[in-house]
Amino acid sequence: MGTSHNLTASKVLEEVRRIVGEVLGDRKASVYLFGSWARGEATRTSDIDLAIEAPAPLPPGTLARLRERLEESSVPYRVEVVDLKEADPAFRRHVLEEGLLWSD
């Protein structure tokens, strides 16, 4: 998988994880990678799909701040972030069944 910034797939995901960790801080939350990146089928035009599920509501602006940090980062892919608490039940089930749990 080639990238415009010469980052390997593992380095790209490592950078995304670092940013997610910085923005979420010590808040309890499960972070899932799902979609083509989780299946190992990503291409240079694939976006990175993340879902976040926190036991307590995230403070206002947290996801917006996360999206902004990811956009401004060196990650050469679009990163979609979904709050599972606000997701459709069928979509939530799909993510929980097929997504890769990054952190808890």
Language-model segments: residues:
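Catalytic core of pol beta-like nucleotidyltransferases
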Residues: M1-Y32, R39-R44, A54-D104
